Amino acid sequence: MIVFGILEQLDDAARETTDREKFVQFSRRILQTKRQILGIRMPELRKLARQIAQSRRFCVSARDLERLMRNMHADRPYEYVLLCGLMIDCAVYTEFDEATRISLTKTYLQVVDSWAQVDSIIVKDKRHATKAWWDFSLECLSDEREMVVRYGVVSLMANFLDDERIKSVIKRARRVSHEGYYAKMALAWLYATMAVDYFDLTMTELASDNVSDWVRRKAYQKCLESRRFSPERRAAIAGCRRS
């Protein structure tokens, strides 16, 4: 009942999407998912996740959500998977304690097949800056699955770049060895974000042998693409990139 209800909601949302076919084609190029894409934009998906969570019609519990994800069929669309992930952290789920949210996130990461399904569920939130989420993020870094590693890296970037843990983040980033493109791009993104508030520390790390040539180049590139650096720092980054 819940599955068919959610699919019905997704179909309705897809029909209301303007320029749907163009959006589907665009999404197909960048999402790199094997699943069908309905063509629903993120704001609408987030809105739908909240509506389903609040709906008396669905009354989705943690057990229901766990079952939905564990029984994820190959014919479920991309947006269906992402919707499950978004519902994990809906504010209306006040009965979901920290351990439950982490457990559900672990299950969700078993069914994702796109970087966007990972990045879209990670938010900067003090509820996710606890020791339990820190430990979970570190656990993800050593996983064999590319998207799980990406989740760990992006989680550290979103919630743990502070004075207390910055050196620990750098130390842990050195241990990431996954060769997948999206795992390595997450590392480059991490360093570029880190450089905003910890510029000298990050530049020193990027210049060291602790960072691969590929990640280093991409990190410099992402820094130069950002508008968060002063002209002086951009010049310094460009100089490091050329050396």
Residue ranges and their predicted role:
Residues 1-243:
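Alpha-helical scaffold domains
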